[in-house]
């Protein structure tokens, strides 16, 4: 019923995703009250609201925190929740082409936000248009657009304080066929005294890495305090040592970025740097060696947490050591954990607090897990639609990622990454396969119709 409309608008769908990618909408929480997440986030919101209005929808800008695009009549409200903020991207991170200059090649659309989440938002918008122009429904359908998803969710919290809550829906910000469970998310800050014998630590840098990204870069700059020559064992292909003036030098570590929900897909530059330091230096205390030996840098269920891996049907606990900071002889380590749905976030934090004496542990943020029965109406309906439209025979899955599906009851994440495809969220050369995006739009149209008729 809806496929022909989406096929006929394929070029326009891709064009509109490109227009969104051109806006470097990295959320900036230090912005002013007129632009709570920065001018670029305001610009991208106004762009899509103007687009929605031109397509015949009702729209609303909610104080530049978020907005929505809506059609239909009725008391009940079906929701689709996406976001237009993106994680940072720099050309010197290794992008083949500039991250905010969209490019189509080999059937893929490249650019920051192409799959997370600008492409899926546009796919959802055109799915709404296909339904609106083709049939009548008995409920309202609202596409809610956030601007702070990659950080603290202040946008969706603002929405919840000021606007009507949908009673059912999905977020196009993960994987097909559908997500029945999302792990809990726990971000911790660890602090402890740290110094290296015979060296002054001038700087430790992780290049402003986001806590939900596996760090691709880490460095430490040292000044030697005696006149002895330094002899460092560098058996690491991804470690670089640069001699500077005045008896100083910089050690740099180079890894591979990935989403913190899948740390196994990346190579953590902090972990590499720590291993190098332990191989080459002596320390004023045993802190770094102790946390390393206890498994703090393990990416799968750090061994100090339990004798056996912590896991359930939602998967195994994962850990991403994301950020290092250093000031006044204090080393700060920021960690992002994805915790199986049956395990208490408080219990995990307590185990970190008990890891070592004098270790200070603070909770930076947390999100409780979500779990919806696989045989619920919502999960079964969306999985059936996906399998029918795609030709797959897939079952619902659990993920470590955190999506807006957590914002409301009776919501799940739904696409756009297809089964068996690599998750390109937060990665260098992020892309979405064009055929997959068009198929996702067709799937969303059918889902909107089934949930709102």
Would you name each region that the model predicts?
Residues 2-110, 134-137:
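Acidic/His- and Gly-rich active-site-bordering loop/insert found
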Residues 84-86, 144-153, 172-177, 418-420:
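Acidic, glycine-rich active-site loops and adjacent beta-strand->loop/helix elements
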Residues 150, 156-340:
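Midchain, well-structured core segments that form catalytic/ion-binding scaffolds
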